[in-house]
Amino acid sequence: MALNLRINRQIRAPRVRVIGSAGEQLGILSIKEALDLAKEANLDLVEVASNSEPPVCKIMDYGKYRYDVTKKEKDSKKAQHQVRIKEVKLKPNIDDNDFLTKAKQARAFIEKGNKVKVSCMFRGRELAYPEHGYKVIQRMCQGLEDIGFVESEPKLNGRSLICVIAPGTLKTKKK
Protein backbone atom coordinates (compact mmCIF):
# COMPACT_ATOMS: atom_id res chain seq x y z
CA MET A 1 0.00 0.00 0.00
CA ALA A 2 1.47 3.34 -1.00
CA LEU A 3 1.25 5.67 1.97
CA ASN A 4 0.96 8.97 0.15
CA LEU A 5 -1.01 10.77 2.85
CA ARG A 6 -0.44 14.45 3.52
CA ILE A 7 1.01 15.21 6.93
CA ASN A 8 1.46 18.40 8.95
CA ARG A 9 2.43 21.32 6.64
CA GLN A 10 1.58 19.38 3.46
CA ILE A 11 -2.15 19.75 4.20
CA ARG A 12 -3.52 22.55 1.98
CA ALA A 13 -7.11 22.98 3.24
CA PRO A 14 -7.79 26.09 5.39
CA ARG A 15 -10.21 24.22 7.70
CA VAL A 16 -10.21 20.52 8.62
CA ARG A 17 -12.32 18.10 10.65
CA VAL A 18 -10.01 16.83 13.40
CA ILE A 19 -10.07 13.45 15.13
CA GLY A 20 -8.00 13.13 18.29
CA SER A 21 -5.37 10.50 19.01
CA ALA A 22 -7.87 8.44 21.05
CA GLY A 23 -10.44 8.56 18.22
CA GLU A 24 -12.63 11.34 19.65
CA GLN A 25 -14.07 14.07 17.39
CA LEU A 26 -12.52 17.47 18.08
CA GLY A 27 -14.66 19.29 15.49
CA ILE A 28 -13.86 21.54 12.56
CA LEU A 29 -10.77 23.65 13.24
CA SER A 30 -8.47 25.87 11.24
CA ILE A 31 -5.32 24.17 10.01
CA LYS A 32 -3.18 26.28 12.39
CA GLU A 33 -5.20 25.21 15.47
CA ALA A 34 -5.08 21.57 14.37
CA LEU A 35 -1.31 21.70 13.88
CA ASP A 36 -0.90 23.32 17.31
CA LEU A 37 -2.94 20.52 18.94
CA ALA A 38 -0.81 17.89 17.20
CA LYS A 39 2.41 19.64 18.21
CA GLU A 40 1.28 19.81 21.88
CA ALA A 41 0.75 16.05 21.87
CA ASN A 42 4.11 15.45 20.09
CA LEU A 43 2.22 13.74 17.25
CA ASP A 44 1.54 14.38 13.57
CA LEU A 45 -1.58 15.71 11.85
CA VAL A 46 -2.40 13.23 9.07
CA GLU A 47 -5.01 13.85 6.36
CA VAL A 48 -6.91 10.54 6.20
CA ALA A 49 -9.81 11.56 3.93
CA SER A 50 -8.94 14.33 1.50
CA ASN A 51 -12.03 13.94 -0.70
CA SER A 52 -14.57 14.97 1.95
CA GLU A 53 -15.53 18.56 2.74
CA PRO A 54 -13.80 19.65 4.95
CA PRO A 55 -10.95 17.08 4.77
CA VAL A 56 -10.68 14.70 7.74
CA CYS A 57 -7.40 14.78 9.64
CA LYS A 58 -6.31 12.60 12.52
CA ILE A 59 -3.74 13.29 15.20
CA MET A 60 -1.41 10.27 15.32
CA ASP A 61 2.19 9.11 15.25
CA TYR A 62 2.73 8.83 11.49
CA GLY A 63 5.92 6.75 11.76
CA LYS A 64 4.18 4.15 13.93
CA TYR A 65 1.17 4.15 11.58
CA ARG A 66 3.41 3.49 8.55
CA TYR A 67 5.18 0.68 10.42
CA ASP A 68 1.87 -0.96 11.40
CA VAL A 69 0.53 -0.82 7.83
CA THR A 70 3.66 -2.37 6.32
CA LYS A 71 3.71 -5.05 9.04
CA LYS A 72 0.07 -5.98 8.28
CA GLU A 73 0.92 -6.23 4.58
CA LYS A 74 3.85 -8.56 5.29
CA ASP A 75 1.72 -10.74 7.58
CA SER A 76 -1.01 -11.04 4.97
CA LYS A 77 1.56 -12.06 2.34
CA LYS A 78 2.95 -14.72 4.69
CA ALA A 79 -0.54 -16.11 5.27
CA GLN A 80 -1.10 -16.64 1.56
CA HIS A 81 -0.06 -20.03 0.21
CA GLN A 82 0.40 -20.34 -3.51
CA VAL A 83 -0.67 -23.70 -4.87
CA ARG A 84 1.86 -25.03 -7.31
CA ILE A 85 1.41 -27.92 -9.70
CA LYS A 86 4.09 -30.59 -9.30
CA GLU A 87 4.47 -33.35 -11.86
CA VAL A 88 5.06 -37.07 -11.38
CA LYS A 89 5.96 -38.91 -14.60
CA LEU A 90 5.17 -42.60 -15.00
CA LYS A 91 5.48 -45.22 -17.75
CA PRO A 92 2.72 -47.75 -18.54
CA ASN A 93 5.00 -50.70 -17.69
CA ILE A 94 6.39 -49.27 -14.42
CA ASP A 95 7.71 -51.72 -11.83
CA ASP A 96 6.05 -51.98 -8.39
CA ASN A 97 8.93 -50.49 -6.40
CA ASP A 98 9.31 -47.61 -8.85
CA PHE A 99 5.56 -47.01 -8.65
CA LEU A 100 5.69 -46.93 -4.83
CA THR A 101 8.53 -44.39 -4.96
CA LYS A 102 6.54 -42.15 -7.32
CA ALA A 103 3.40 -42.55 -5.16
CA LYS A 104 5.39 -41.53 -2.06
CA GLN A 105 6.71 -38.49 -3.93
CA ALA A 106 3.19 -37.50 -5.04
CA ARG A 107 1.89 -37.97 -1.48
CA ALA A 108 4.60 -35.62 -0.16
CA PHE A 109 3.62 -32.97 -2.73
CA ILE A 110 -0.07 -33.20 -1.81
CA GLU A 111 0.66 -33.06 1.94
CA LYS A 112 2.55 -29.79 1.35
CA GLY A 113 -0.62 -28.39 -0.27
CA ASN A 114 0.43 -28.63 -3.92
CA LYS A 115 -1.53 -30.13 -6.79
CA VAL A 116 0.03 -33.12 -8.53
CA LYS A 117 -0.06 -33.68 -12.27
CA VAL A 118 0.33 -37.41 -12.88
CA SER A 119 1.42 -38.12 -16.44
CA CYS A 120 1.92 -41.51 -18.03
CA MET A 121 4.26 -41.24 -21.02
CA PHE A 122 3.88 -43.63 -23.95
CA ARG A 123 6.87 -44.49 -26.16
CA GLY A 124 6.79 -46.24 -29.49
CA ARG A 125 4.13 -48.94 -29.77
CA GLU A 126 3.03 -48.50 -26.14
CA LEU A 127 0.45 -46.02 -27.49
CA ALA A 128 -1.41 -48.94 -29.07
CA TYR A 129 -2.38 -50.08 -25.54
CA PRO A 130 -3.55 -46.96 -23.65
CA GLU A 131 -5.48 -49.15 -21.16
CA HIS A 132 -2.14 -50.02 -19.47
CA GLY A 133 -1.60 -46.31 -18.83
CA TYR A 134 -5.16 -45.90 -17.52
CA LYS A 135 -4.54 -48.75 -15.05
CA VAL A 136 -1.36 -47.10 -13.74
CA ILE A 137 -3.09 -43.70 -13.36
CA GLN A 138 -6.12 -45.27 -11.64
CA ARG A 139 -3.81 -47.12 -9.24
CA MET A 140 -2.09 -43.81 -8.38
CA CYS A 141 -5.44 -42.05 -7.86
CA GLN A 142 -6.71 -44.83 -5.58
CA GLY A 143 -3.50 -44.72 -3.55
CA LEU A 144 -3.90 -40.97 -2.95
CA GLU A 145 -7.67 -40.72 -2.47
CA ASP A 146 -7.31 -40.50 1.34
CA ILE A 147 -5.50 -37.12 1.10
CA GLY A 148 -6.55 -35.81 -2.31
CA PHE A 149 -9.20 -35.96 -4.99
CA VAL A 150 -9.05 -36.23 -8.77
CA GLU A 151 -9.49 -32.71 -10.09
CA SER A 152 -9.34 -33.68 -13.76
CA GLU A 153 -10.00 -37.17 -15.05
CA PRO A 154 -7.27 -38.95 -17.06
CA LYS A 155 -7.11 -37.64 -20.64
CA LEU A 156 -4.93 -38.74 -23.53
CA ASN A 157 -2.93 -35.71 -24.67
CA GLY A 158 -0.58 -36.55 -27.54
CA ARG A 159 1.71 -39.31 -26.32
CA SER A 160 0.87 -38.90 -22.63
CA LEU A 161 -2.06 -39.61 -20.36
CA ILE A 162 -2.58 -36.76 -17.87
CA CYS A 163 -4.54 -36.52 -14.61
CA VAL A 164 -4.48 -33.81 -11.89
CA ILE A 165 -4.88 -34.64 -8.19
CA ALA A 166 -5.60 -31.78 -5.75
CA PRO A 167 -5.17 -31.78 -1.95
CA GLY A 168 -8.22 -32.25 0.27
CA THR A 169 -11.20 -34.51 -0.10
CA LEU A 170 -14.08 -34.44 -2.53
CA LYS A 171 -16.37 -33.27 0.31
CA THR A 172 -14.27 -30.14 0.94
CA LYS A 173 -14.22 -29.38 -2.79
CA LYS A 174 -18.01 -29.34 -3.06
CA LYS A 175 -18.45 -26.86 -0.15
Curated annotation (Swiss-Prot):
Matching InterPro entries: T_IF-3_C_sf (IPR036788), T_IF-3_N_sf (IPR036787), Translation_initiation_fac3_CS (IPR019813), Translation_initiation_fac_3 (IPR001288), Translation_initiation_fac_3_C (IPR019815), Translation_initiation_fac_3_N (IPR019814)
Q: Which GO terms describe its cellular component?
A: cytosol
Keyword Kinase tagged? no
Q: What is its main location?
A: cytoplasm
Location within or outside the cell: Cytoplasm
Which residues does UniProt call coiled coil? none
Q: Which NCBIfam families match?
A: infC
Q: How does it assemble?
A: Monomer.
What's this protein's family per the entry? Belongs to the IF-3 family.
Q: What is this protein called?
A: Translation initiation factor IF-3
